[in-house]
């Protein structure tokens, strides 16, 4: 992993791996992310990323307004773009489940399915977890998924994450019950 600033005196970091780069969100990424999330072209990702929560429609203007906080945020950014061969293909993020107890959860989405099952998500998540441990005062990074997303579970296990909890049959999607999976790494 190589970490460097975007430009001299820049507080924002770029994280370079072998096949992916994690970089801060740019204004020019907003319409790309909007098309991935709300467009008709790349919808396969939503079948695996908490599909039991409906995706509420949003205008591009409202989406851009919601993304502005990520444009202004300094280190450490809460969301970064995953780039592969110069193309923005997804995002990594973190959020505080409970900041007062330093309980942090991370997430990842690769939107176009043509980039799945190539190790890009695993590499991006590894870079992101390393970055979070280096830049935040935390002892653990958590990740929550569901039993309907075996690729996410495999990627987390490859990185040394342990299954810390399994809430059985608490996710209901298309007439089938699934388990909620809590994973973590110290």
Residue ranges and their predicted role:
Residues 1-32, 79-186:
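Acyl-donor (CoA/ACP) binding surface of acyl/acetyltransferases
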Residues 8-10, 66-70:
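Short, P/G- and charge-enriched loop/turn segments at secondary-structure junctions
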Residues 27-34, 38, 60-64, 68:
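An amphipathic alpha-helix signature
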Residues 39-40, 149:
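Short loop-to-helix capping motifs
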Residues 42-67:
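Conserved GNAT-fold acetyl-CoA-binding loop/helix
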Residues 70-75, 161:
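Short loop/turn motifs at secondary-structure junctions and domain boundaries
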């Amino acid at each position: 992993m190589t970490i460097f600033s975007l430009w001299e005196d820049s507080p924002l970091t770029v994280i370079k791996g072998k096949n992916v780069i994690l970089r801060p969100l740019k204004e020019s990424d907003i319409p790309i992310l909007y098309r991935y999330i709300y467009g008709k072209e790349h919808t396969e990702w939503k079948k695996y990323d908490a599909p039991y929560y409906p995706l509420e429609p949003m205008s591009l203007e409202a989406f851009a307004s919601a993304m502005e906080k990520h444009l202004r945020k300094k280190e450490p950014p809460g969301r970064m773009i995953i780039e592969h061969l110069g193309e923005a293909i997804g995002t990594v993020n973190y959020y505080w489940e409970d900041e007062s107890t330093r309980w942090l959860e991370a997430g990842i989405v690769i939107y176009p399915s043509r980039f799945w099952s190539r190790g890009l998500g695993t590499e991006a998540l590894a870079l992101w977890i390393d970055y979070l441990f280096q830049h935040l005062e935390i002892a653990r990074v958590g990740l929550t998924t569901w039993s309907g997303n075996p690729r996410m579970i495999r990627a987390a296990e490859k990185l040394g994450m342990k299954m810390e909890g399994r809430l059985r049959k608490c996710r209901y999607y298309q007439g089938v019950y699934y388990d909620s999976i809590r994973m973590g790494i110290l």
